[in-house]
């Protein structure tokens, strides 16, 4: 959530930064309503001051011995009653204006950072580095992961469709075991790196989704329970970040690092026709998420560390990947800066996103009211929040099924996973 004071004091800069994003955003309605609200507030304050003055005068006159029924006192009381009537009309309108302003601001995305490349689409993203060229598979006839998975009997899409609908998968035998091994390996790696594991609720309330920025703008992309004001989580970022909603944290307890494994649920509205086959874009998928709550002065350094934590998984699995600095037009709603990690999928000859690591600055903290206080200092400040995948489990499986695929159709198991599976080949 953007700061209304910042919008008010730097309207041209704010509008320019918003214009660099995809989509159309106009802050003029906010400025107009803000002007009305501030004028109304000033009027109400003046009237309230006069009401307080009248009360004081009346009290002094009565204390001095003047009869309470004196015409002068009665006139003051009549004026006071008139003021109360005015206040009863002004206060609801002021609250209404504040609510309208808040809803308009909630619809605005975060401002891109100065180090985010300017661009309107993913074609203008900037590649930062590549890793693992020496691990690129030499097999020229890679079978797509969904085909080899079904051939090996570890993936079944047809029965998942029967149970649910399209864009679901059933993992069987070694497929389910491989997924579990990946989850355990990812969590172990991140807890060793200093993250504290949490197992959060998979259903969250509206305030939680609003706090992290999915609501109100992206309601159609989430699954909502029909009879409850609860939503299935699209990512563990939502419940983990909101663990601290409405709290004032001690500065000495920052930074806070959490990792969490959860299933995630997304409608994928508007993506029909894209990645309809395989494990890339499902309605339900598993993910290990990394969340940081940090001091504002360290958030960009923490972003680099976060990317390194996600990269550590890919490097341990010896999966070729690249790091992309997203341009302003491809930036997520709540992010000020994002790096995507894209893993190599040889069947398509493309790098595909497997992790998105973002610094949300104070955007989520303002929405969720997460603050911190430094010992011996007055007042509080908003924390900065960060999140990233460490990693998307299904996409990691897809990358293994393709990059470790052998000419005879078997799949070598990455060395770091063999201890979890007790085997070397699928």
From Swiss-Prot:
SUPFAM superfamilies: Class II aaRS and biotin synthetases, tRNA-binding arm. PROSITE patterns: AA_TRNA_LIGASE_II. This is Serine--tRNA ligase. ATP binds at residues 266-268, 353-356. It is found in: Cytoplasm. One of its GO terms (cellular component) is cytoplasm. Consists of two distinct domains, a catalytic core and a N-terminal extension that is involved in tRNA binding. One of its GO terms (biological process) is selenocysteine biosynthetic process. Homodimer. The tRNA molecule binds across the dimer. One of its GO terms (molecular function) is serine-tRNA ligase activity. Catalyzes the attachment of serine to tRNA(Ser). Is also able to aminoacylate tRNA(Sec) with serine, to form the misacylated tRNA L-seryl-tRNA(Sec), which will be further converted into selenocysteinyl-tRNA(Sec). Pathway: Aminoacyl-tRNA biosynthesis; selenocysteinyl-tRNA(Sec) biosynthesis; L-seryl-tRNA(Sec) from L-serine and tRNA(Sec): step 1/1. It is an enzyme of class 6 (ligase). The lineage of its organism: Bacteria, Bacillati, Cyanobacteriota, Cyanophyceae, Nostocales. The keyword DNA-binding does not apply. L-serine binds at residues 235-237, 289, 389. Belongs to the class-II aminoacyl-tRNA synthetase family. Type-1 seryl-tRNA synthetase subfamily. It catalyses: tRNA(Ser) + L-serine + ATP = L-seryl-tRNA(Ser) + AMP + diphosphate + H(+); tRNA(Sec) + L-serine + ATP = L-seryl-tRNA(Sec) + AMP + diphosphate + H(+). The keyword Nucleotide-binding applies. Its EC number is 6.1.1.11. Keywords: Aminoacyl-tRNA synthetase, ATP-binding, Cytoplasm, Ligase, Nucleotide-binding, Protein biosynthesis.
């Amino acid at each position: 959530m953007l700061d209304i004071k910042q919008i008010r004091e730097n309207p041209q800069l704010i509008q320019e930064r918003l214009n660099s994003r995809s989509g159309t955003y106009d802050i003029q309605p906010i400025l107009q309503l803000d002007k009305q609200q501030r004028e109304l507030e000033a009027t109400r304050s003046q009237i309230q001051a006069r009401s307080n003055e009248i009360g004081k005068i009346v009290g002094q006159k009565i204390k001095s011995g003047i009869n309470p029924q004196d015409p002068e006192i009665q006139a003051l009381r009549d004026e006071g009653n008139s003021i109360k009537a005015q206040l009863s009309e002004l206060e609801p309108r002021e609250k209404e204006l504040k609510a309208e302003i808040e809803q308009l601001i909630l619809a605005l995305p975060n401002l891109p950072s100065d180090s985010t490349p300017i661009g309107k689409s993913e074609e203008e993203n900037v590649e930062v580095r590549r890793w693992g060229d020496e691990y690129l598979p030499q097999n020229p006839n890679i079978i797509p992961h969904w085909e080899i998975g079904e051939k090996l009997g570890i993936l079944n899409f047809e029965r998942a469709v029967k149970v649910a609908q399209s864009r679901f998968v059933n993992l069987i035998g070694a497929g389910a075991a491989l997924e579990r091994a990946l989850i355990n390996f990812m969590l172990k790696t991140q807890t060793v790196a200093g993250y504290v594991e949490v197992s959060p609720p998979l259903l969250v309330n509206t305030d939680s989704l609003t706090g992290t920025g999915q609501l109100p703008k992206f309601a159609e992309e989430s699954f909502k329970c029909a009879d409850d004001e609860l939503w299935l989580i699209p990512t563990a970022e939502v419940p983990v970040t909101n663990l601290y909603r409405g709290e004032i944290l001690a500065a000495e307890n920052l930074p806070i690092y959490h990792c969490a494994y959860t299933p995630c649920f997304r409608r994928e509205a508007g993506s029909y026709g894209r990645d309809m086959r395989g494990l890339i874009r499902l309605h339900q998928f598993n993910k290990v998420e990394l969340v940081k709550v940090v001091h504002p002065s360290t958030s960009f350094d923490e972003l680099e560390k976060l990317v390194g934590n996600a990269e550590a998984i890919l490097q341990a699995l010896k999966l070729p990947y690249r790091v992309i600095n997203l341009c302003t037009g491809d930036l997520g709603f709540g992010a000020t800066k994002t790096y995507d990690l894209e893993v190599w999928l040889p069947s398509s000859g493309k790098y595909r996103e497997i992790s998105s690591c973002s610094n949300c600055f104070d955007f989520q903290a303002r929405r969720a009211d997460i603050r911190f206080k430094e010992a011996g200092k007055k007042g509080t400040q908003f924390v900065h929040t960060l999140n990233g995948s460490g990693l998307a489990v299904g996409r990691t499986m897809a990358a293994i099924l393709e990059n470790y695929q052998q000419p005879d159709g078997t799949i070598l198991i990455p060395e770091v996973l063999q201890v979890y599976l007790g085997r070397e080949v699928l």
